[in-house]
């Protein structure tokens, strides 16, 4: 490995014996021998890896050459079948594109929505226009008025004054667009006139005994 002859090795041993002495020389020889072994093992592993990589590269090259040769030497039957498959695939593509071209003119695309209110409600301008035409126009004003009835209760056969009950109802006015308007019912006021029984007071005064006080000396 290092191209060292016997004379050179003997010279190295003599120098080591003089420098290290007889006690350290065997230890030095062992360490040097261990280093030589490790270096030889590393060199062997590197050579083996390089050889394997070269073999793998050669195999790959040979496989590529074999595939190219096999494709060139195909039988005419295989070539015909491959051509038929290609033609069928192209026919399917042409039919698909023709169907798409026929369906394209019949499709109706919605126009772009530019109004923010229509975008928020999710209604296109065309739909809003049709809804506006279809909806009938409401009358300008619809006023529903209710009559305020007055109830008059007459008293019985006795001489009582009539009791009058007045109930008022509010009028409901509907808006122009027929939107629901909240109707506030005003509280019902009942006016009752106090009854004065004059007849009973007169009769009560008549029933009381009249006391005659004697006057003074006449």
UniProtKB/Swiss-Prot annotation:
InterPro entries: TatA/B/E, TatB. The chain crosses the membrane at residues 1-21. Residues 126-145, 174-218 are annotated as: Disordered. It is a single-pass membrane protein. Residues 199-218 have a biased composition (Basic and acidic residues). Keywords: Cell inner membrane, Cell membrane, Membrane, Protein transport, Translocation, Transmembrane, Transmembrane helix, Transport. GO terms for molecular function: protein transmembrane transporter activity. Pfam families: TatA_B_E. It is found in: Cell inner membrane. One of its GO terms (cellular component) is TAT protein transport complex. GO terms for biological process: protein transport by the Tat complex. Its main location: membrane. The keyword Cell membrane applies. The keyword Amino-acid biosynthesis does not apply. Part of the twin-arginine translocation (Tat) system that transports large folded proteins containing a characteristic twin-arginine motif in their signal peptide across membranes. Together with TatC, TatB is part of a receptor directly interacting with Tat signal peptides. TatB may form an oligomeric binding site that transiently accommodates folded Tat precursor proteins before their translocation. Belongs to the TatB family. The Tat system comprises two distinct complexes: a TatABC complex, containing multiple copies of TatA, TatB and TatC subunits, and a separate TatA complex, containing only TatA subunits. Substrates initially bind to the TatABC complex, which probably triggers association of the separate TatA complex to form the active translocon. This is Sec-independent protein translocase protein TatB. It comes from Yersinia enterocolitica serotype O:8 / biotype 1B (strain NCTC 13174 / 8081). The lineage of its organism: Bacteria, Pseudomonadati, Pseudomonadota, Gammaproteobacteria, Enterobacterales.
């Amino acid at each position: 490995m290092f191209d060292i002859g016997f004379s050179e090795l003997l010279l190295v041993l003599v120098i080591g014996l003089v420098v290290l002495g007889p006690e350290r020389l065997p230890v030095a020889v062992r360490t040097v021998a261990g280093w030589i072994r490790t270096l030889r093992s590393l060199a062997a592993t590197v050579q083996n890896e390089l050889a394997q990589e070269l073999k793998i590269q050669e195999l790959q090259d040979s496989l590529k050459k074999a595939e190219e040769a096999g494709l060139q030497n195909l039988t005419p039957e295989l070539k015909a079948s491959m051509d038929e498959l290609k033609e069928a695939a192209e026919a399917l593509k042409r039919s698909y594109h023709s169907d798409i071209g026929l369906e394209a003119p019949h499709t109706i695309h919605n126009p772009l929505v530019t109004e923010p209110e229509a975008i928020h409600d999710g209604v296109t301008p065309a739909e809003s226009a049709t809804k506006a035409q279809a909806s009938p126009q409401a009358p300008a004003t619809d006023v529903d008025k209710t009559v305020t009835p007055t109830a008059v209760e007459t008293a019985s056969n006795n001489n009582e004054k009539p009791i009058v009950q007045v109930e008022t109802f509010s009028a409901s006015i509907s808006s122009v667009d027929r939107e629901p308007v909240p109707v506030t019912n005003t509280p019902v006021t009942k006016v009752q006139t106090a009854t004065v029984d004059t007849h009973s007071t007169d009769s009560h005064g008549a029933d009381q005994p009249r006391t005659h006080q004697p006057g003074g000396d006449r």
